[in-house]
Amino acid sequence: MKRGAVRAATTVTVFLAALEIGLRIYNPFPFRVRGDHIVLPAHQSYTISHPGAVRMDPVTHVTKNSLGFRGPEPPRDWSERLTILTIGGSTTECLFLSDGKTWTDELRRRIDVIRPDVWIDNAGFEGHSTFGHLVLLREFVVSLRPKIAIFLTGYNDMKIASALPIDSELNPHNLSAGHRALTWMADHSEVAAVAENLIRMKRTYEANVRTTEVDLPGLPRRTLDDERTNAILEEHRTKSLSGYASRLAEIVRISRQNGIEPILMTQPALYGDVIDPSSDVALGAVAIGPLSNGRAEWQSLELYNDVTRRLSVDAGVPLIDLAREMPKDSRYFTDWVH
């Protein structure tokens, strides 16, 4: 029995060593987080299918430049240009929109009419909250030093109160001792990096952090009394808001400390206590998740938007209040926030 155990251990060791060598030569898994660091997907392109899509294109084509961002290559006359990065989660990266169709692309076209010296790239990272934005800022944006960084934040920070976000694992304080060990191994081993990212993919799927279309007329309705609505709001107030405020203030501080002027954006959403003009559906009564509805979700998101608004006033940061400017009309959305 002992000899068999030794033989099995030797076989496993040889297999893992061979797998490690093979993955170091060629790794077919282009994961964008390794250990507690971001790996930008430089010079990568994706073709993403959306079976059964109605509002989204059935196939989207996404290209990343030498920086790992969406958009044009950085100009050689960098110091002479007005350089801008847009930073956010999936509502900024927009993997469900092909090249040229994101809001960053539209912003570039509009600014180019009056400022042809502008360079704008999309540094959005699907699934990231302000935890991930801080890592991106420290590891990449500070050294790149654009003149302006536009931050669209809020929605993914809500997920921290109810589900493990993709990027919470970028903060070692959020990890168990065992997971910290796996993170350390992922920094030094291709096999461990693949294993860790497969775990992240599973958790992301289970947390429902993904993009789908919403069929408003087919959704169930849910009525919540004031007591239940207030309980949902109080959970956000006690679990997430202060941390979000601290991280957003840190983003502003680091940006300005490094000569980058931040611009804040509030997060719009389709849900709210209104009637959708395109479908005549009462958005406030639509059931969202296992416990909430459109009215409660909008009130929850507005707690985070209010944090952004207050920081804009207190720190003198320019604000684009998109949450109040964008119409709640399903013509402009594929799901609740995209």
Predicted regions and their residues:
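Histidine-centered active-site loop/cap adjacent to the catalytic His
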Residues: 5-7, 244, 310-320, 333-338
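Helix-to-loop transition at the C-terminal end of transmembrane segments
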Residues: 22-34, 274
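Membrane/wall-proximal cationic-aromatic binding patches
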Residues: 30-110, 114, 328-330
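Conserved beta-strand elements of the Class I
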Residues: 83-87, 121, 149-151
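Proline-aspartate-enriched helix->loop->beta-strand connector
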Residues: 141-150
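Serine-dependent acyl-ester chemistry module
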Residues: 156-309, 327-330
